[in-house]
Structure formats: C-alpha cells, structure tokens
From Swiss-Prot:
Disulfide bonds join C30-C45, C67-C97. It comes from Streptomyces orinoci. GO terms for molecular function: serine-type endopeptidase inhibitor activity. Keywords: Disulfide bond, Protease inhibitor, Secreted, Serine protease inhibitor. Pfam families: SSI. This is Protease inhibitor SIL-V2. InterPro entries: Prot_inh_I16_SSI, Prot_inh_SSI_I16_CS, Subtilisin_inhibitor, Subtilisin_inhibitor-like_sf. Transmembrane segments: none annotated. The record marks K69, E70 as: Reactive bond. It is found in: Secreted.
Length: 109
C-alpha cells in the first residue's frame, strides 16, 4: 500500500459513557483523499493531521469560552484506524455547550 489507512467512525451521544445513547454518527476517511459522511471531511482530516492524531488536542476547549456548569453530559467517540494505528477514543464533555466549544470541528456534525 502507498499510504497508511485512515478510516474512522465518529459518534456523538447523550450521556457520560462511550455506550451513551448515540444521537449522530458519521464516517471519515482521510486517505487517499478526504471522504465519508462527515459534513466537512477535508477540514476534519486537516485538523487530525495537524494534531498528529492526538484526539485529546481536538477536544480541548477554545480559550475565552464561557459555558454554564450544568451537568448534561455529551460523549464523543472515534473508532477505527488513523495512519495505520488502531483508534478507540472517547471523551465526555460536561454539556453540549462545552462540546461546541472544542477547538476542533472534527466532532461537529
């Protein structure tokens, strides 16, 4: 193969675990070209490359963001393969506002 595979299933669910009720799911493939059902596959792949596949960097909160402290958890997951490496990632945000305040748009769908 000329390139390492990068194919992921991304989900957003209501609840505080990866097994939370999934509300939305998309596919994202970044090699050989960005594709899948993600609404902005090109940008999502570019952000993943820039973060070197480190999903924790993608879920960090933008500076200057203000959200209420309500506990209404939203969990995002990424499973599949990134540049040939197996991925099984999940992150729980305190509420939908915190999820929307993430630096990256990888989980914006």
């Amino acid at each position: 193969s000329l390139y390492a595979p990068s194919a992921l299933v991304l989900t957003i669910g209501q609840g505080d675990s990866a097994s939370a009720g999934i509300q939305r799911a998309v596919t994202l493939s970044c090699m050989p070209t960005p594709s899948g059902t993600h609404p902005d596959a090109r940008d999502a792949c570019a952000q993943l490359r820039q973060a070197d596949g480190k999903f924790d960097e993608l879920t960090a909160t933008k500076a200057g963001t203000y959200c209420t402290k309500e506990w209404n958890p939203v969990t995002v997951t990424a499973t599949g393969v990134w540049e040939g490496q197996r991925v099984n990632y999940s992150h729980t945000f305190g509420n939908p506002c915190m999820a929307k305040a993430a630096k990256s748009t990888v989980f914006s769908f």
